[in-house]
């Protein structure tokens, strides 16, 4: 069953300006070490950060909290499955909120779709609760 849906659009130009103005102060506040390493080794650095920023916003919406109620930017990390498919790893307040959304005997599966078509980046997040025997 679906327990949360979120989407977000992010202007890549805004992220590029923020990177120019605030650099590491911005990236260290919003992104995990792994996300920074992945984005910083690419030529399209702003696009990578914008996709991840949109994913975090979409996840916060899917959790039903936004970036409040103890959910912080770095509680949500965009990672890739072995197949290359993006997903989210949650920690701290985001993981706690996710646990509150799940019915007893269910585990979460987070579905993430990321795209960009400059100047915009977009993300969708769906939180699915699956019975533990199926989620395995």
Curated annotation (Swiss-Prot):
Enzyme Commission code(s) on record: 2.7.8.7
Family annotation (InterPro entries): 4-PPantetheinyl_Trfase_dom, 4-PPantetheinyl_Trfase_dom_sf, ACPS, Ppantetheine-prot_Trfase_dom
Native source species: Methylobacterium radiotolerans (strain ATCC 27329 / DSM 1819 / JCM 2831 / NBRC 15690 / NCIMB 10815 / 0-1)
Function (record text): Transfers the 4'-phosphopantetheine moiety from coenzyme A to a Ser of acyl-carrier-protein.
Residues the entry annotates as binding Mg(2+): 8, 57
Family membership noted in the UniProt record: Belongs to the P-Pant transferase superfamily. AcpS family.
Lineage, opening ranks: Bacteria, Pseudomonadati, Pseudomonadota, Alphaproteobacteria, Hyphomicrobiales
Pfam assignment, any one: ACPS
Localization of this protein: Cytoplasm
Cofactors that this protein relies on: Mg(2+)
Molecular function via GO: holo-[acyl-carrier-protein] synthase activity; magnesium ion binding
SUPFAM superfamilies: 4'-phosphopantetheinyl transferase
Gene: acpS
HAMAP family: AcpS
Reaction it catalyzes: apo-[ACP] + CoA = holo-[ACP] + adenosine 3',5'-bisphosphate + H(+)
Protein name as catalogued: Holo-[acyl-carrier-protein] synthase
GO cellular component: cytoplasm
UniProt keyword annotation of Magnesium present: yes
